């Protein structure tokens, strides 16, 4: 299943919030600005290095590609 950058960003944000992280946490760990993280989570930035942060913090790739994110961010 192919998802849009916007949907990918929304799922990453949902995962981040569910885990209790803030955009400032992602920014500090990746070296990117909060504005870059916000752009990623709204689909305006497709930086794969930012995406790696979510995987490094436990998000499973399956969550990005399942239909409608039906299992939620806990998978």
Stretches with model-predicted labels:
Residues 31-46:
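Recognition helix of helix-turn-helix/homeodomain-like DNA-binding domains
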Residues 12, 23, 34, 51:
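Helix-turn-helix DNA-binding elements, focusing on the entry/boundary residues of the two helices
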Residues 64-75:
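Short amphipathic recognition helices of helix-turn-helix/homeodomain-type DNA-binding modules
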Residues 46-65:
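DNA major-groove recognition helix of helix-turn-helix/homeodomain DNA-binding modules
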Residues 1-18:
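A short, Lys/Arg-rich alpha-helix, primarily the initiator
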Residues 12, 26-27, 37-40, 64:
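Conserved hydrophobic/aromatic packing and binding residues within compact polymer-binding modules
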Residues 16, 27, 54-55:
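The alpha-helix within a helix-turn-helix
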């Amino acid at each position: 299943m192919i998802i849009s950058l916007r949907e990918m960003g929304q799922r990453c944000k949902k995962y981040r919030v569910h885990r209790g992280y803030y955009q400032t946490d992602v920014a500090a760990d990746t070296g990117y600005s909060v504005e870059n993280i916000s752009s990623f989570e709204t689909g305006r930035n497709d930086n794969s290095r930012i995406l790696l942060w979510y995987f490094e913090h436990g998000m499973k790739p399956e969550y990005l590609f399942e239909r409608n994110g039906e299992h939620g961010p806990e998978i």
